[in-house]
Amino acid sequence: MKRVTRSIASASVAVVALIGLLAGCSSPKARFYTLDPDNTVERASTATPVRVVVGPVTIPDLVDRPQIVTRVSANEVKVNEFARWAEPLKSEISQVIAADLRTMLGSDQVTVVDTGSNAMPAWRVRVDILSLYTEPAVAVSMDALWTIQPPGKQPAIAGRSVVREAVAGDGFEAIISAHNRALASVSRDIATSLRTPSGR
């Protein structure tokens, strides 16, 4: 009986050791990231009395996925399984542009959804991201076409923003910060058109 007891005890120790080994070899947990309005954007000293609805926003199929896609070389990209967007990237971009415009225009009437409950006519902003390249520790490059549709039958206003923001450091936090600044540059171009006489 003593020999049997020792065998069982030895087997138990082996099982515990194996479980510990497997736990140590398990895949790392994914981390989730969100975009934010650029914290260097200052609120307009004079408000622009305008209601704006941001959307739709389109992005390239390459980056339209939960994983953050980074560029390895001219013809190679990396789909980062353990670095993911907390929300669909299109939704993140539209919300950040709307938040940037609220600050830049000094208007709280900038949304991503038109409820139709406001009597003030809305200006509609469509943004088509033609390319979005992320080079870790180097730069985020963005090429965006945007169209402002005024209320009524006024002609649309079209523009293009080509932006390159340096990634100041290693890691995904630095990458996200560069995305935020790139979107702020796009928002700044849109806000300028909304403020000009031809844009209002």
Please give the residue ranges for each predicted region.
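Bacterial N-terminal signal peptides that target proteins for export
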Residues: K2-V13
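C-terminal motif of bacterial Sec signal peptides marking the signal peptidase cleavage site
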Residues: L21-G24
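Surface-exposed short loop/turn segments
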Residues: S26-R43, A47-T48, M104-G152, V167
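N-terminal segment of the mature soluble domain
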Residues: P49-A119
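Generic beta-structure capping elements
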Residues: G55-V57, I68-S73, L145-T147, P151, ...
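Short secondary-structure boundary motifs at beta->alpha junctions and helix caps
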Residues: V77-A86, G152-R188, T192, G199
